[in-house]
Design a protein with these regions (language model features):
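Phosphate/nucleotide-binding beta-alpha loop and adjacent structural elements of enzyme active sites
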Residues: 1-283
């Protein structure tokens, strides 16, 4: 049996202690300005040196999580500075979370967005967290289990343009930069095989009649996922809100042109992400 990537100790066993606890409390109180962030990052660095490879059991964005901040930039942010974790994007999502809201978190990592949406949206919301990297998926599933949120489902696969087994490129320095594309991965990226599905296949398997919002953090593969979906899916399945990682790659510019042609309008752009809404939703 393969070794689990989540420590089996009861939750709370790895609660922050000593210098690490002091640093964590301080970093979470740091403001969002330049000086506040510099201070938070300095204190975080000190805490990480003390912590070593051990995990942390914390509450982040309202959810209990076991985080491994040395392995993944997203987990480092969730542990020490959740106030910096895509705050404008989360606010945009929170405005829309009501009733039987359907949200897909694609490239869910350990559940930051998914668990935020689950807790904010209430028990009637339907949250699907999609994470392809097996070791990160284990941590995602663990965090969902700890949260007690029955409205979140985790799926271990990659989204791509065709159904079938695919190759993932895993950045050894940051598991959050895992991708089906070589773009952005380091030259010594580890390669693994994982199941792949199209977004339309996934939506049909889940029985979705609509998608209220989707977040994509898939390291340059956004066009591979969205273009065949827009081509083949019924209009009623087009997401009302799209939040995706923003890069300067030409493929992203092509995708933005495609989104505008389908009636999407840009409503938010941050240093890392861009968000679009369907114009018909604003009528």
């Amino acid at each position: 049996m393969p070794r689990s990537n989540v420590d089996a100790a009861p939750f709370g066993h790895y609660a922050p202690r000593g210098l690490c606890a002091l640093a964590l409390r301080a970093t979470r109180r740091c403001p969002t300005g330049w000086l506040g962030k510099r201070t938070a990052f300095f204190l975080r660095g000190l805490a990480l040196r003390v912590l070593g490879a051990r995990p942390l059991d914390v509450v982040s964005l309202g959810a209990p999580m076991r985080l491994y901040p040395q392995r993944n930039v997203a987990e480092k942010r969730l542990a020490f500075t959740p106030q910096y974790f895509d705050a404008p994007e989360r606010a945009l999502l929170a405005e829309r979370l009501k009733g039987e809201f359907v949200f897909l978190d694609v490239g869910a990592s350990v559940g930051g967005y998914a668990l935020f949406a689950a807790r904010f949206g209430g028990p009637r919301a339907r949250i699907l967290a999609v994470e392809p990297l097996p070791e990160v998926f284990e941590r995602l599933a663990y965090n969902i289990g700890q949260s007690g949120c029955a409205n979140v489902k985790a799926v271990g696969c990659a989204l791509i343009d065709v159904d079938g087994e695919i190759t993932l490129f895993v950045n050894p320095g940051n598991q959050g930069e895992t991708s089906v594309c070589i773009v952005g991965a380091e030259a010594n990226a580890r390669q693994i095989k994982v199941p792949g599905k199209t977004l339309l296949t996934l939506a049909r398997e889940e029985g979705y009649e609509r998608i209220d919002a989707i977040k994509l953090d898939i390291e340059g593969a956004e066009e591979l996922v969205l273009e065949p979906f827009f081509r083949d899916a019924p209009r009623t399945l087009r997401p009302r809100l799209i939040i995706m990682e923003f890069t300067l790659l030409p493929v992203v510019a092509t995708l933005e042109t495609r989104l505008r042609s389908l009636g999407y309008r840009e409503i938010l752009r941050t240093r890392e992400n861009v968000a679009y809404t369907l114009a018909e939703e604003e009528a």
